[in-house]
Amino acid sequence: MAAKKVFGSAEASNLVTELRRSFDDGVTRGYEWRVTQLKKLMIICDNHEPEIVAALRDDLGKPELESSVYEVSLLRNSIKLALKQLKNWMAPEKAKTSLTTFPASAEIVSEPLGVVLVISAWNYPFLLSIDPVIGAISAGNAVVLKPSELAPASSALLTKLLEQYLDPSAVRVVEGAVTETSALLEQKWDKIFYTGSSKIGRVIMAAAAKHLTPVVLELGGKSPVVVDSDTDLKVTVRRIIVGKWGCNNGQACVSPDYILTTKEYAPKLIDAMKLELEKFYGKNPIESKDMSRIVNSNHFDRLSKLLDEKEVSDKIVYGGEKDRENLKIAPTILLDVPLDSLIMSEEIFGPLLPILTLNNLEESFDVIRSRPKPLAAYLFTHNKKLKERFAATVSAGGIVVNDIAVHLALHTLPFGGVGESGMGAYHGKFSFDAFSHKKAVLYRSLFGDSAVRYPPYSRGKLRLLKALVDSNIFDLFKVLLGLA
C-alpha cells in the first residue's frame, strides 16, 4: 500500500501560491471559464448520480430519494440558475450620481475576491461542498475545497470527480482531517466559507482574524417549532416528521430541535405523531430503509448521552430504541424535559425531539428569545396575526410558516444564520455575492472643472459647496443668483 502523502504547512502554502498565480494571470475571471466549469459540474451531477447515491449510502445510510432529491437535484437547480443568470450577475450595476459629482456616471462592479477556501460538512457532503463552490466559480475565484473526513466515501468521490472534470490550475480538493485543515487555515485566503458546528466555527473565525480574512459561517443551533392548536394537525405532523426524520434522521442544520405547544394540545400532537411515524417507518423504525443512520460511533454515543441523562430518560413518550452496532436510533419523542438538561443545552443533530408544553402559546416567544438565535424557526397555525407576529419578532436565520426546511430550496431567499447560528448567506445570487467584492467605480469628465472646490476658500464657495453636497437645487440657484 502506498504511503499517504503528507499535507502540512509547506504543501498548503505551495497550493495557495499556485492558485494565486492562476488567479493573478486572469484564468478564472472570464465568462467562458466560469461557464465551462459550471457545465462540468452539471456533467458530474448528470453522469455520476448512481455513484453519489452509493457514496451517501456508505457514509450515512441515506435512502436514494433523500440523496437524489436533497443533494443532486438541488445542485442541478443551483447550476442551472448560475448558467442562466451569470451574464446578468457579472454585469456592472448602474448607480445614481449627485450634483456633487456632476457630470459623472457610476457603477458597482462585482469583482472576484481571489483564492477562497470552502470547508464543508459531513451531513450533506455533496450539496454542502459543491453548492458554495458554484458560487465561488460563478464569481470568478480560484477555490480549494476541504470536504469532511467524517464522510470518507463522499470525500473520496468528490476528490476523484472534481479532479477529473474541473480546471486543476484553479480548483483543488484537499482531503484529510485536523492536520490538513489546520495547515490550510494557516494560509492567507481571500475568503473562508465554513459549514459545520459553532465550536469549529469559532476556530475558523480566530484563524481568519489573523489575516483579516472575511468569513461565511453556516452553523446551526436549536431550531424551534411552535405548534398552535389552530392548525391542520395531520398536515402539521407529517411535515414535522419529514423535516426531522426524513432529512438525514435529524442530522441537518435546519432540523427541528424542539417543539413548543400548549399543555392542552400536546397529547393530541403526540398521538398524531405516533400514528404518522408508524405509517412512515413501521412498527420497528430502526429496521426501516427509509431512514438514515447516525454518522459514526462518536455521534451515536453523544446522542445516547443526551438520552440517558437522569432527568431525561424517563421523559420518553415514543421510541428510544438504540442499535449501536448498526448506528441506528429510532425516532424519539420526549415530553417536558428540564430546560437545563443537556438535550436542551446543545444542538441535538439527531433523531431526538423534545416537546415542551406551555400554559399558552404566548410563552413560546419568551422561550425562543431566551436562547441563542437559531438558524431556523418554524410555526404551524392558521392564525394570521400569529403568523405576522412570529415573522416580525422572532430573530432567526430564516422563518418558515406551516412547513419545515423548504426555504433552503428557494434561490430567491438568502440562506444563512444570525448571531451564534452563523454569519453571511448564500444560495442563488446570494452565493455569487458572497464570493464577490462590490467595487464602487465613478467616471468623471475632465471638462467643466469648477474653481469652487479649490483654495483660497471664501464664504461664497462655502455656500455653493454646501448646496452642492446637500443636492439642494433651490439653494444652489439662490447662491448662483446672489440671493444667498
From Swiss-Prot:
Molecular function per GO: 3-chloroallyl aldehyde dehydrogenase activity; aldehyde dehydrogenase (NAD+) activity
Induction summary: By abscisic acid (ABA), dehydration and salt stress in roots. Isoform alpha is up-regulated in leaves but not in roots upon salt treatment. Isoforn beta is up-regulated by salt treatment in both roots and leaves.
Effect on the protein upon substituting residue 45 to S: Decreased solubility, loss of dimerization and strongly decreased activity
Phenotype seen when the gene is deleted: Increased sensitivity to salt stress.
Top EC class of this enzyme: oxidoreductase
Site (Transition state stabilizer): 123
Oligomeric and partner information: Homodimer and homomultimer.
Name of the protein in its database record: Aldehyde dehydrogenase family 3 member H1
